Every structure is written in C-alpha cells, then in structure tokens.
Amino acid sequence: MSLLQFSGLFVVWLLCTLFIATLTWFEFRRVRFNFNVFFSLLFLLTFFFGFPLTSVLVFRFDVGVAPPEILLQALLSAGCFYAVYYVTYKTRLRKRVADVPRRPLFTMNRVETNLTWVILMGVALVSVGIFFMHNGFLLFRLNSYSQIFSSEVSGVALKRFFYFFIPAMLVVYFLRQDSKAWLFFLVSTVAFGLLTYMIVGGTRANIIIAFAIFLFIGIIRGWISLWMLAAAGVLGIVGMFWLALKRYGMNVSGDEAFYTFLYLTRDTFSPWENLALLLQNYDNIDFQGLAPIVRDFYVFIPSWLWPGRPSMVLNTANYFTWEVLNNHSGLAISPTLIGSLVVMGGALFIPLGAIVVGLIIKWFDWLYELGNREPNRYKAAILHSFCFGAIFNMIVLAREGLDSFVSRVVFFIVVFGACLMIAKLLYWLFESAGLIHKRTKSSLRTQVEG
C-alpha cells in the first residue's frame, strides 16, 4: 500500500467515522442512553476502530492486507450500511397517539421478581458446576485455545447457559438502583466471568459484557463521566490483551509485544479486515440465502432429540472460515454483520440487512422505554434486565452476523421467558399452600420500630 492510497483510505475512514460519531453524539446528548447509541458505538468499534491498527501493522511491520480498492469497498459498505440503518431507525412506523391505558401483558410482584433472578442465577451456576465436574479448569489443562471446541471437551452446550448469571444480577441491581448495587453488579459479574474464563479455557465474553453494562449503567445514572468512560475503555483493551496472552500461552516483549498487541486488539474488537477478505473473494462465494439462519439453530438441538443432526453447522461464520479462508483449525472466524449479509445474498443483502437491523434496534428501544415508563418497579426491573441482558446478542450481531444473532436471541428469549414462567408458577403454588403473606403497612412499621 502506497502513501497516496493510504491517504485516500484515511479520508474515507475519517468521513465515515465523523458521520457516525456525530449522529451518535447528538443522540447521546438527547437521551444519554438507548440501544441506538449502544449499537452505533459497537458498529464504530467493529468496522472503524481497526483501521488505524491495520495502518500501523502495514507501515511499521510490513503486514500484508487486502488490496486498497477492497479496503475502500469495506469502508464504504460499512458507511452506507449505517446510513440506511439510521434512516430506518429514525423512521416512525405509525402515528404517535396519546397514551391510553391498556391491559398489561403481564405483571410482576416482589416474590415473583426475586424468584426470577434466583432461577436465572441457578441456571447459570448449575450449568457451570456440571461443566466443571466434567472438564475441570480447562485453562490449565489444554495446550491451545482451539481445543475447547474439540471432542476432548464434554458438555459444550452448557456454556450457552453461563451467560444468564448477568441478567440475574441485573434484576438485583434494577430493584435498588443505587451505587452499592451498581458496584455489587460489577464485582459479582466480573468474578463470575473470571471463573468461567478459567473453567472454559479462555472465553472472555462474560467479562467484556459485564464491564460494558457496568459502564453504560454508570453513564445513565451520571456516576461516571465521558473521560472516565474513555479511561475505562483503555483499561479494558489492556485487560483483554493480557487475558488473550494468557489464553494463547504467549510470552512476548519489545517489538513483538507491540505487534502482538496491535493484531490481537484488532481481531478482538474490530475484525473489519474479515469483511475485506470476503469482498476480495466475492466472485467465489456461493450465496447461501437465508439457510444459515436456520442452520444456526441446529446447535441448540440436542443430539438425543435429533440423532442425525449434522455435526458441522454451515452458518456464515463457518462458511467464511472453511470455504473462503480454507481454515479447518476448529475455530470459527467472525465474518462481521455485513460479511454475514454478503455470504447470504451478496451486495443486495447489505441495505436489506440494514433495514432489518434498524427495526431490531427500534424494538429493543421500545421495550427499554416501556420499562422506563412502567410504574411497577418489579416489572420495570424485569424489562430492563431483559434489554440489558440482550447486549450480548447485539455484540454477536455486530461481530458474528445476523444468522448467529437470530438463533441466540431466540434462545435468550425462550430461556428468560421460561425462568419467568417458572417463577410465576412457583409463586402460585406457594400462595395456594398459604406460604405467601402480603406485607401490610402496620407490619412494616413494626419491623422498622423493632
């Protein structure tokens, strides 16, 4: 890449970054937080944060990258995607009418809400316990990270339930919403994330998500400022780099350490070059249509329920890894959101996907606002826990693609909804047995005086 070519790419990158950052800033000034702000920051991180890192790798370490015209296509496709997404998100689908009382879909009380977070936490802890009994601490047993996807590890499906510890702790926080509950959320979820990091053998997702939710709650409540958020972001990048070194068993120093930091940080936070690789091999892609969305559900079907279930699932990540990169190491490589759309239907699917994503984020913001307006604090805690708990799925959307997002968000809704229904059923059983006694003002006053 020549300096002239880099200059052209830099101008396009700068314009796209300023365009998205400006719209995000205006939205932040207006509402302080919603899921459009979160997705916009996530989109910036995924598709634009990596460009400076790639540039340093090219000019400082002479690392090979895709041709400049392909990198240009990747930047422009990301910028155009966001423009279509933003217009879709801002388009009002129906006329705004005055709020009229409606019969709520469901209600929550104190006991049901506490039962819900206890069940969610129980799902996570029991899953971790069973996985640990089968495998022990994989971080200290396995020689390479890719081995966690091999047949040596049993009970892999249980890992999908670990994440429900975070929604459980979110319910606890939203019931109190003070600084002590906020700090308790951070300590409990990060401690759990470190535990799963050691047990699973290097998976950092629970730590990243817990820390991100903690920061956004702090921004919403005004407990942290933007410069503190930036400082925490830098600390998070360094922390993730250190965990990556431990995961891969690397011991580096000097120029090698700087080089390793650049490419690991790029691959962890901003795999935008994967989109460029897909575009470079565009003519060789056999478009998969909507089949990857259906196939991605296969991993959630137990083999005892479907004995003939395919052992290798050809979703967009695996198609990119196996067919485009010819990589059969056992580790799927993220195609990114736009890359998954390219695999499914080529360039035509990029604007269509942007419209779909705009509607998805609009729905989450509608649910979030519903929680903000809800007078029942127990129901509001459940709604907010569901919305913030789905942040993991939005990260999957940006990094892994639309097919992975759909299967995971459906799984999240089913498990979260099942825990909610079990809590309501248990409350009904306890109430029928006479074990539930409603609090009265006189009893509360007696407790306070005592």
UniProtKB/Swiss-Prot annotation:
Q: What is the superkingdom listed in this entry's lineage?
A: Bacteria
Task: Report the Pfam families cross-referenced here.
Answer: WzyE
Compartments annotated for it: namely: Cell inner membrane
Regarding the membrane, this protein is recorded as: Multi-pass membrane protein
A single GO cellular-component term on record: plasma membrane
Can the keyword Membrane be found in this entry's annotation? yes
Tell me where the transmembrane regions lie: 6-26, 37-57, 63-83, 118-138, 155-175, 181-201, 207-227, 228-248, 341-361, 378-398, 410-430
GO BP terms in the entry: enterobacterial common antigen biosynthetic process
Q: Which UniProt keywords apply?
A: Cell inner membrane, Cell membrane, Membrane, Transmembrane, Transmembrane helix
Pathway where this protein functions: Bacterial outer membrane biogenesis; enterobacterial common antigen biosynthesis
> According to its UniProt record, which protein family does this protein belong to?
Belongs to the WzyE family.
What is the role of this chain? Probably involved in the polymerization of enterobacterial common antigen (ECA) trisaccharide repeat units.
How is the quaternary structure described?
A: Probably part of a complex composed of WzxE, WzyE and WzzE.
Could you identify this protein by its name? Probable ECA polymerase
The organism encoding this protein is Escherichia coli O17:K52:H18 (strain UMN026 / ExPEC)
> Which gene does this sequence derive from?
wzyE
